Amino acid sequence: MPTINQLVRKGRHSKTTKSDSPALNYAYNSMKKKMNYNPAPQMRGVATRVGTMTPKKPNSALRKYARVRLSNLIEVTAYIPGIGHNLQEHSVVLIRGGRVKDLPGVRYHIIRGALDTAGVDGRKQGRSKYGAKKG
């Protein structure tokens, strides 16, 4: 425990927290060819690869994912939630933060029902999370 004199001289340092979704924190200025710190809740991107991957140890499945080049030129791996999807290469998608616990390196989710991504067909409950219309 520090003495009062040590606290007067140095003070307390607050811990710096790392972002859970660092790619959403920067915007690219194409005129200046520079990255600016400009945090955003979502970001648009183009799918460069769509595929499946297998989850970590206790789980077993084929999880759908897309490799996305964002509008700030950063390329990330994003999870495609829900049953079935219509994404292919060059589809324009909207991503949000949020990792998938059993897929290493997947820190983003694709928002269903936005831009080129269709909502989940025949979904009755939790529709707003999957871009499904009523009925």
Swiss-Prot record:
One term under GO cellular component: small ribosomal subunit
Pfam families assigned to the protein according to its UniProt record, in alphabetical order: Ribosom_S12_S23
CDD domains: Ribosomal_S12 (cd03368)
Entries under SUPFAM superfamilies matching the protein: Nucleic acid-binding proteins
List of residues that carry 3-methylthioaspartic acid: 102
Keywords of this entry: Methylation, Ribonucleoprotein, Ribosomal protein, RNA-binding, rRNA-binding, tRNA-binding
GO molecular function: rRNA binding; structural constituent of ribosome; tRNA binding
Region feature (Disordered): 1-23
GO biological process, one term: translation
Keyword Ribosomal protein carried by entry: yes
The keyword Ribonucleoprotein appears for this protein: yes
Record-linked PANTHER family: 30S RIBOSOMAL PROTEIN S12 FAMILY MEMBER
Complex and partners: Part of the 30S ribosomal subunit. Contacts proteins S8 and S17. May interact with IF1 in the 30S initiation complex.
Protein family per UniProt: Belongs to the universal ribosomal protein uS12 family.
Entry function: With S4 and S5 plays an important role in translational accuracy.
Protein name: Small ribosomal subunit protein uS12
Organism of origin: Lactobacillus gasseri (strain ATCC 33323 / DSM 20243 / BCRC 14619 / CIP 102991 / JCM 1131 / KCTC 3163 / NCIMB 11718 / NCTC 13722 / AM63)
Gene label: rpsL
